[in-house]
From Swiss-Prot:
Residues 34-110 form the Lipoyl-binding domain. Its main location: mitochondrion. The active site is at H431, D435. The gene is mrp-3. It is an enzyme of class 2 (transferase). It holds the Pfam family 2-oxoacid_dh. Residues 177-214 form the Peripheral subunit-binding (PSBD) domain. GO terms for cellular component: mitochondrial matrix; pyruvate dehydrogenase complex. Its EC number is 2.3.1.12. This is Dihydrolipoyllysine-residue acetyltransferase component of pyruvate dehydrogenase complex, mitochondrial.
Amino acid sequence: MIVPVLSRQALRHASVARVALPSLTRWYASYPPHTVVKMPALSPTMTSGGIGAWQKKPGDKIEPGEVLVEIETDKAQMDFEFQEEGVLAKILKDSGEKDVAVGNPIAILVEEGTDVNAFKDFTLKDAGGETSPAVPKDEPKNESTASAPTPAPTPAPEPENTSFTGRFQTALEREPNALPAAKRLAREKGIDLRNVKGSGPGGKITEEDVKKALASAPAAGAAAAAYTDVPISGMRKTIAARLKESVTENPHFFVSTNLSVSKLLKLRQALNSSADGRYKLSVNDFLIKAMGIASKRVPTVNSSWRDGVIRQFETVDVSVAVATPNGLITPIVKGVEGKGLESISAAVKELAKKARDGKLKPEEYQGGSISISNMGMNPAVQSFTAIINPPQAAILAVGAPQKVAVPVENEDGTTGVSWDEQIIVTASFDHKVVDGAVGAEWIRELKKVIENPLELLL
């Protein structure tokens, strides 16, 4: 007995839905033993469907898992698969036919070895006739469709109904009709079997078909391998492990503010002009110093989460993010609360050079109590958020300076607009250590110092 499988992907990751449908009927009568394949119901509410492309033609053998025909509904296009062997003897509904009622005959199948030519003149009437799609109960019944067909001179015996279990799958999800060797070769060579025409029995793709496709499309094969696997360095593995740990273990929260740096830039220019080349201060040097002052005023931020305790540090050791050819590293400027701007600037430059040259000592990058990551050298970066450097509890992310129009009130009472240099900074805090109000207080102290930069000189 020939048993079909209907398959359909109802959802992207849907499990197989099992159904039982009386879609096969076994007939004997004046024709050789055969099976009538009927239009299946793909859902409880389906009353009719359309016939898509037939994947087999009369005389073709059907093997387990092969698609016989596509069934179309108003929502999807389904494959009609079989799980046992048989031969297609007659197609009763051609491709493109619409509104074929559920239960109406669509094809005839026979066992292998049966004379298919015996079904050349086989008609729908021979298969038991067809009915119209079910009519809703509130509509009058059409008497013409309810009348029985003219009985045949020799009544056929009662059909043997066969139920089956099956599953549904969209046609797009269909596995290519290919021999195992062809599938293996296609997988090795990166060939998409959906683009290969089969020359084997029933359109099955052979190994030779895959070889021909490979020879005729060298460009496609080259495009499929257009990438390079870069070995992961030890440093990259360390960065990945630490940042993954931080995101997983530290509940981040973020506080942002706009810093007016117009006064700071004027002070920086004045100090650099009077330095006679002894130093050249950067905005980052001022920010590092300001972080030291803010962290002494709000010491909770200058802490780290340890097993059983929160460790609060006496000195503010700022880890400065430096990009190197091998990845990001954070050398430490220690005790910034007690250092002057010139000393901080010299330490940052020396540590950054060592970092790029790969000459940092472990004690120069291991530890630290708080971090800063500055992308201000890139004018495209207005703001960003940074991941906390564990086991620290805070990191400051610094964007590029932006000219912002701000309203001003003149001495004569009139109003106008002036341009102000501003930087957006965003602090990331570990909520295990720092509460929201504490983080906001730290940002307020940082803003106060930066916008009144003479405090940095005290």
